[in-house]
């Protein structure tokens, strides 16, 4: 049973399948993640598993977090995530979740922070078409009309305009695991995932629209 796992994006590469075709893949260094808390219906009203990832220093962890982490082990961790599960039977505080819980061919969702691009214009942020470049035109990269004048006399909320682009948490769904390397704690996932190399990723079994067909189901 794969609960979920935290990891770090290493970068993209290519993988050759059995037919010799090159498949674009992302390398993710996932886990090991320590079970830091088990939640049950009796104590919390629902069942869940909390995992910790990423060793850190004493000065970077506050006193309440140190007490919380001390229940499951000595090493301090910098990232905590919670995963809902149907049952916590067989799970124990301090145990590790590794890539061995995943298998090739399994579909997963990958969540992370997208690459921040700062304040960006209409073309870069929303893919607007540019204006004419010649014949006296002066509106090469301007947006054009943003609405009528007298009525409504304002710009509607949600209008696509220039602004901060990227740096938000997004989820890429239905990615297929091509290979699991237990020796190096690697998940090789087909396609791209959010974030830049070195950023934190949350990997969990596929949910949502494709959940019916995820993980080999019919």
Curated annotation (Swiss-Prot):
Its main location: plastid. Part of the 50S ribosomal subunit. The gene is rpl3. InterPro entries: Ribosomal_uL3, Ribosomal_uL3_bac/org-type, Ribosomal_uL3_CS, Transl_B-barrel_sf. GO terms for biological process: translation. Residues 127-161 are annotated as: Disordered. HAMAP family: Ribosomal_uL3_B (MF_01325_B). It is found in: Plastid, Organellar chromatophore. One of the primary rRNA binding proteins, it binds directly near the 3'-end of the 23S rRNA, where it nucleates assembly of the 50S subunit. Signal peptide: none annotated. It comes from Paulinella chromatophora. Pfam families: Ribosomal_L3. This is Large ribosomal subunit protein uL3c. One of its GO terms (molecular function) is rRNA binding. Belongs to the universal ribosomal protein uL3 family. The keyword Cytoplasm does not apply. Keywords: Organellar chromatophore, Plastid, Ribonucleoprotein, Ribosomal protein, RNA-binding, rRNA-binding. SUPFAM superfamilies: Translation proteins. GO terms for cellular component: cytosolic large ribosomal subunit; organellar chromatophore; plastid.
């Amino acid at each position: 049973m794969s609960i979920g796992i935290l990891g770090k994006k290493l970068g993209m590469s290519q993988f050759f399948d059995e037919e010799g075709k090159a498949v674009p893949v992302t390398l993710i260094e996932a886990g090991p993640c320590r079970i830091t808390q088990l939640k049950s219906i009796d104590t919390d009203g629902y069942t869940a598993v909390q995992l910790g990832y990423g060793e850190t220093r004493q000065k970077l962890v506050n006193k309440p977090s140190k007490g919380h982490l001390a229940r499951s082990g000595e090493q301090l961790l910098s990232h905590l995530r919670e995963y809902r599960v149907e049952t916590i039977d067989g799970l124990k505080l301090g145990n590790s979740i590794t890539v061995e819980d995943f298998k090739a061919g399994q579909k997963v969702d990958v969540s992370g922070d997208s690459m921040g691009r700062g304040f960006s214009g209409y073309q870069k942020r929303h893919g607007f078409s540019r204006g004419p470049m010649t014949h006296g035109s002066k509106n090469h990269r301007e947006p054009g009309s943003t609405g009528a004048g007298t009525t409504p006399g304002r710009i509607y909320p949600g209008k696509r305009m220039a602004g901060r682009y990227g740096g938000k948490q997004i989820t890429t769904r239905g990615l297929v695991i091509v290979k699991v390397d237990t020796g190096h704690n690697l998940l090789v996932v087909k396609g791209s995932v959010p974030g830049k190399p070195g950023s934190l990723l949350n990997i969990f079994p596929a949910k949502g629209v494709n959940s019916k067909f995820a993980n080999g189901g019919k």
